[in-house]
Amino acid sequence: MALILGITGSPRKGGNSEVLLEVFLKETVEATVKVEVFSVRDLKISPCLGCRFCEEKGFCKLSDQMGEIYALFKQADLVVISTPVFFYGFPAQLKALVDRSQALWSRRYKLGLRDPKSPWRKGVVLAVGATKGERLFLGIELSSKYFFDAIGAHFEGVIGAKGFDRPREVLGDEDFMYRLRQRAKELLFPLTRRKKVLFVCKHNACRSQMAQAFLEFYGGDRFEALSAGDDPWKEIHPMTFQLMAEKGLDLYFRKPKHIEDILEDAPFDLVVSMGCEVSCPMVPGKRFVQWDLEDPIGKPIEVGREVRDLIEKKVKELLEGV
């Protein structure tokens, strides 16, 4: 299922920005999607040091909860930020999260790596301010534009409410609430129409990971791609990162999954077995395909490149055939 990631940026509990997110996410009840929500005030996120470490290494040197957030950004199909306006910008807690996304910007623009979901991921901001200034949301719009670009998402704009200060006061604006619900439906609807494809191999450490990434990159608007294995490793094989980096795709924040972890997404429209040396688990699906691909792990990198290119070709053929 598609993942909707909701982020509340207010340092205050129960305020208007939380109400906006609640109303927006109510539209997911009837949609077949997953929802995960967190408040930045509950996280320990240090401010960016401006040290440029991420520009050289591709990851942040600071060790805190931001590491978990990076992974969530990469899993999400839609990122929704709900925030109050503080001096025409984000509150400090949310600004720290935005600044720390420099690490993802570095992976894209310094290392030349694209997240496979980035062509299709979307981001939107719900904002509420106590005043009614003509340019009340200008600062947030500019920051959001570059933040969403950094995490690999198309910025869908700010849905803003002006003149609300008391907790939950914004609920009284019925016209705004209607517009908010309608925009939520518009953003959620395409995610519920995609066909689900599962790629399966034994360890979910190489072939199935590459297939998932290629389908996400080339056809993420029409397909929801997943991958899993019946004996998953703890980490993706290092060669897989190298092979996909040669194609400009970034798998750094991904982990192998057990087949049981994705059964909640069943049934699948298509299940593709990559070529199991032992026995791949059976999962609920409408159609099953066997690709019989060689396992490149433990073999020369040239073998890995041949398998990778064959997977890419097969994914493109799959897209052309639908």
Located regions from the model:
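Short, structured active-site "lid" loops
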Residues: 52-75, 240-266, 270-280
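Phosphate-binding/catalytic loops
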Residues: 126-133, 163-167, 280-322
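N-terminal beta1-alpha1-beta2 submodule of the flavodoxin-like/Rossmannoid cofactor-binding fold
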Residues: 1-106, 174-196, 210, 250
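Conserved active-site segments centered on acidic
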Residues: 192-261
